């Protein structure tokens, strides 16, 4: 267990609060700006167990008006057990600082050396002014987002009446195990990931909570608050620089918007200055020598090294050269000089040199030393700053064209089945890989995406060597595979040159007029264009929550695939230009399924192009599949000689097939990749079947034996259609359902 785990638990705590309070937009924004990983906790019960809150939970349930979230339980616990201070003038509620281990330092600390910052100043309650408090269990200030306990710093007026309160945590029995675990992690604490470091460069104010921040500001409110705390704790006699002076001396480094998720990153400009952690480095190195001798938590060997890095590295700013522009090649040389590779996304490196074994009081000096080292080493490399998208809101004319292509009319709308359908996964342990379908309609889209998710899960990445873990992914693994699958589908539809991602903004961009019926979805779309597959993957990972949890996840993917291919090319793919992608009763057409599987919305499933002579000299071209597909396709219509599925779909690159049976699409797959390249493996093999709509409660495993002949059909109505589909590829094969009830 390391600090990354602590961060994910804290983030899960905030997500649970947002979910229970119905703050859906904030919830979506948080998942976009801070995507989940394997360590994220998605169950309230699991979160309660990890934090050892069972006692508080039972006590809360017995109350007349119980609290609804774990975050409120923790908050009330501290408010009830800490007590009030004697300072009636400030009327503040102190929050204890969680001890941070230090090296062999058992001397009692003076009052001025402890860092106990009040979480909320009641005297400022009417104007909503807030202050931040040192993050529990970590010797660093790395959460300008306020994503730990939701504390945001006001830039209007700080509290100068903070009073330290020494609290005995021995009475906190129910929470002691969780907090002790946090304290003991510091010796092996990895650095903040790249995303966290990028977030540190974003200024925050009260407007960010409502998503109203339009651009960067010159300095961060938390920086000025930290400087005032330094003045009080170390009794510095010299005058510190004002924020205006710091602004003049700081160099504009990178201009990033307050909302990084699915938005474009504008280029850096000299007239919009962003306060980066590198800008803080110089002022911290100036204040450091004047701190009292109580900074014993960091060895004498470490402090000169940190100062030399800030003085010699091009990352540090000089007061005489404060107006010179920092170039990206200087940043790369800085990483090279330190012997550190620029960190990749979600990769952490150890930055703490301390090997502590006993907790002591948190000191501001330790925080500053840790902050300097992290700011230098873990600043995002230039490649992470190059993710740019071209975005534009949808307009009325484009919305009309899309509706005509989808439904054949601008007066048709998406049905409720489509609007409610997202790419959420099954909670049954043996079916965690499966996407759940709520109602009929978009089953073709779900089956195609399911096949691509299985491709990523079974045959790409780390799980391909461990068959026991393939079909039991963690929540983070399956979400990651979903993001990669969506990126593959869109990149393939865009001809592997570009992709367009359609995301719902929640606000209509135009007023419907004329022959157009609004449906509440198309009118809110913002379209993001990307021309790099790497940027596309990163972008989808940041916004995958809209596809997985909604709203309109299935619709967004369908529209993104259409726009990536372009409306004109989709029409050219059709055999009949007046065809459309969604048929009667909201069912997916073969063209839509082919678009998701192969990147082309062709109307047929045979190979290549067939010329049809009408007899009067006119030749009609029927377009089929042009190349071998990653995901295959089997159809019951072939059993009835209505169509012929070509080998490009029957023998795909991966042993995964979308099955069309009885006007419904489902998925069939094998765990053996050699099934498609070694005829000996085709003698006897297993196929797994999944239907997101069939209320499937257990794994369905079919054993196919091609050495035996299927029994004669005494009554063809009793033969499961799935068996008939299987026999369109493996002629006459015997199918054993292994105890599962055959699906008729």
UniProtKB/Swiss-Prot annotation:
Matches recorded under Pfam families: MINDY-3_4_CD
Reaction equations catalysed: Thiol-dependent hydrolysis of ester, thioester, amide, peptide and isopeptide bonds formed by the C-terminal Gly of ubiquitin (a 76-residue protein attached to proteins as an intracellular targeting signal)
Region listing for Disordered, in residue ranges: 211-358
InterPro entries: MINDY-3/4_CD, MINY3/4
EC numbers on record: 3.4.19.12
Ranges of biased composition (kind: Basic and acidic residues): 300-310
Polar residues: bias regions: 290-299
Chain positions with Phosphoserine modification: 143, 220, 224, 295
UniProt GO BP: protein K48-linked deubiquitination; proteolysis
Active site (UniProt): 443, 664
Keywords associated with the record: Hydrolase, Phosphoprotein, Protease, Thiol protease, Ubl conjugation pathway
Molecular functions per Gene Ontology: cysteine-type deubiquitinase activity; K48-linked deubiquitinase activity
Biased segments, Low complexity type: 265-277
Similarity comment: Belongs to the MINDY deubiquitinase family. FAM188 subfamily.
Record's function text: Probable hydrolase that can remove 'Lys-48'-linked conjugated ubiquitin from proteins.
Protein name, entry field: Probable ubiquitin carboxyl-terminal hydrolase MINDY-4
Source organism of this protein record: Mus musculus (Mouse)
GN (gene name): Mindy4
């Amino acid at each position: 267990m390391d600090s990354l785990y602590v961060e994910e638990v804290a983030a899960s705590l905030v997500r649970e609060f947002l979910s229970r309070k119905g703050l859906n937009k904030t919830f979506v924004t948080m998942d976009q700006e801070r995507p989940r990983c394997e360590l994220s906790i998605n169950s309230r019960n699991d979160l309660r167990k990890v934090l050892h809150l069972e006692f508080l939970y039972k006590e809360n349930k017995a109350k007349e008006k119980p609290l609804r979230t774990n975050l409120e339980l923790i908050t009330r616990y501290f408010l009830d057990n800490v007590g009030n201070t004697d300072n009636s003038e400030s009327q503040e509620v102190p929050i204890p600082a969680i001890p941070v281990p230090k090296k062999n330092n058992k001397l009692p600390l003076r009052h001025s050396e402890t860092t106990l910052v009040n979480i909320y100043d009641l005297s400022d309650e009417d104007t909503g002014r807030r202050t931040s408090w040192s993050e529990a269990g970590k010797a660093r200030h790395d959460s300008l987002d306020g994503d730990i306990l939701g504390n945001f710093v006001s830039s209007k007026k700080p509290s100068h009446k903070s009073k330290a309160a020494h609290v005995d945590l021995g009475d906190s029995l129910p929470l002691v195990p969780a907090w002790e675990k946090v304290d003991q992690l510091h010796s092996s604490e990895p650095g903040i990931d790249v995303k966290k470091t990028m977030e540190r460069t974003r200024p925050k104010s009260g407007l960010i909570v409502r998503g109203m921040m339009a651009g960067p500001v010159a300095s961060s409110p938390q920086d000025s608050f930290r400087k005032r705390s330094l003045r009080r704790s170390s009794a510095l006699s010299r005058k510190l620089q004002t924020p205006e002076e710091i602004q003049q001396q700081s160099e504009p480094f990178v201009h990033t918007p307050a909302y990084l998720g699915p938005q474009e990153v504008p280029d850096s400009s000299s007239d919009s200055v962003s306060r980066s952690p590198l800008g803080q480095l110089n002022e911290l190195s100036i204040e450091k020598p004047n701190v009292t001798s109580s900074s014993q938590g960091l060895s004498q060997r470490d402090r000169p090294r940190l100062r030399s890095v800030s003085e010699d590295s091009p990352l540090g700013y000089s007061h005489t050269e404060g107006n010179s522009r920092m170039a990206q090649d200087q940043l790369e040389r800085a990483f090279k000089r330190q012997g550190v590779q620029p960190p990749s996304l979600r990769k952490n490196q150890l930055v703490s040199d301390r090997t502590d074994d006993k907790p002591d009081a948190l000191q501001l000096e330790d925080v500053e030393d840790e902050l300097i080292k992290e700011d230098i080493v873990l600043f995002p490399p230039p490649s992470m700053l190059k993710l740019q998208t071209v975005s534009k809101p949808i307009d009325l004319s484009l919305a009309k064209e899309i509706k005509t292509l989808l439904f054949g009319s601008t007066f048709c709308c998406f049905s409720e089945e489509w609007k409610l359908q997202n790419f959420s996964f099954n909670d049954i342990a043996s079916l965690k890989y499966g996407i759940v379908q709520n109602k009929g309609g978009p089953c073709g889209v779900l089956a195609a995406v399911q096949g691509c998710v299985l491709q990523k899960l079974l045959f790409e990445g780390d799980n391909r060597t461990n068959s026991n873990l393939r079909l039991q992914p963690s929540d983070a693994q399956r979400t990651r595979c979903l993001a990669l699958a969506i990126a593959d589908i869109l990149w393939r539809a865009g001809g592997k040159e570009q992709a367009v991602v359609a995301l719902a903004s929640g606000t209509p961009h135009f007023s419907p007029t004329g022959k157009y019926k609004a449906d509440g979805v198309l009118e809110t779309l913002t379209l993001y264009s990307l021309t790099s597959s790497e940027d596309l993957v990163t972008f989808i990972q940041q916004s995958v929550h809209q596809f997985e949890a909604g709203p309109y996840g299935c619709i967004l993917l369908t529209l993104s695939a259409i726009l990536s291919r372009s409306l004109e090319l989709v029409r050219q793919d059709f055999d009949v230009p007046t065809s459309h992608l969604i048929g009667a009763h909201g069912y997916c057409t073969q063209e839509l399924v082919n678009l998701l599987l192969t990147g082309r919305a062709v109307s047929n499933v045979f190979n290549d192009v067939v010329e049809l002579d009408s007899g009067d000299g006119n030749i009609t071209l029927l377009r089929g599949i042009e190349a071998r597909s990653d995901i295959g396709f089997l159809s019951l219509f072939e059993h009835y000689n209505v169509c012929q599925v070509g080998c490009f779909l029957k023998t795909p690159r991966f042993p995964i097939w979308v099955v069309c049976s009885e006007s419904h699409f489902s998925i069939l797959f094998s765990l053996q990749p050699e099934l498609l390249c070694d005829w000996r493996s085709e003698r006897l093999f297993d196929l797994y079947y999944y239907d997101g709509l069939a209320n499937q409660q257990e794994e369905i495993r079919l054993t196919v034996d091609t050495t035996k002949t299927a029994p004669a059909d005494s009554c063809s109505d009793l033969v499961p259609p799935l068996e008939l589909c299987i026999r369109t590829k493996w002629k006459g094969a015997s199918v054993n359902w292994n105890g599962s009830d055959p699906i008729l």
